[in-house]
């Protein structure tokens, strides 16, 4: 069992949520508001199971106009750096080479670079996997993630500049 807390504004809200759940289910807290981002030091020590950066809601709550801006301006990297050692994620996954308007490979690269341990499937996944074998596609995604991890460790490669260009 899992239960998610969306749009948390404060660590107090997260504490109340965790108290209500009382370990009867795994918890996912979505980081989707600037106010929770400002409280990461207190947030990271709470007893949640997973955190997920909701790029779309974070964009709206921050008054931005581009979903990728949180990646290009360093916000996502800042959040991830505060969550090291915990299970967290951002962005969505789909078949390798798929995805609109950003191909999944670029997002996967950033996810690996920033140490995420979870992802959700993108809206495009449903359509892109229709005529494909799901097991095969998942294996390709895992293999690509492993290869990217090796490249990043060896070369310290980054697509950060690409996301900066996309927000313009």
Question: What role is predicted for each listed range?
Answer:
Residues 1, 13, 34-47, 94-117:
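Catalytic cores of alpha/beta
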Residues 5-25, 35-41, 60-80, 100, ...:
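Active-site-adjacent beta->alpha loops and helix N-cap segments on the catalytic face
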Residues 6, 49-57, 121:
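Non-cysteine beta-strand/loop elements that form the S-adenosyl-L-methionine
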Residues 17, 63-73, 110-112, 125-168:
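C-terminal helical cap(s) of enzyme catalytic domains, especially alpha/beta-barrels
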Residues 18-22, 42-47, 81-85, 111-113:
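Acidic (Asp/Glu)-rich catalytic clusters
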Residues 21-32, 82-97:
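Short beta-strand/loop segments at the ligand-binding rim of alpha/beta enzyme cores
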Residues 57-60, 95:
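A short, flexible beta-alpha/helix-coil linker loop
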Residues 89-91, 118-123:
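Conserved active-site loop/cleft motifs that coordinate metal ions or position small ligands
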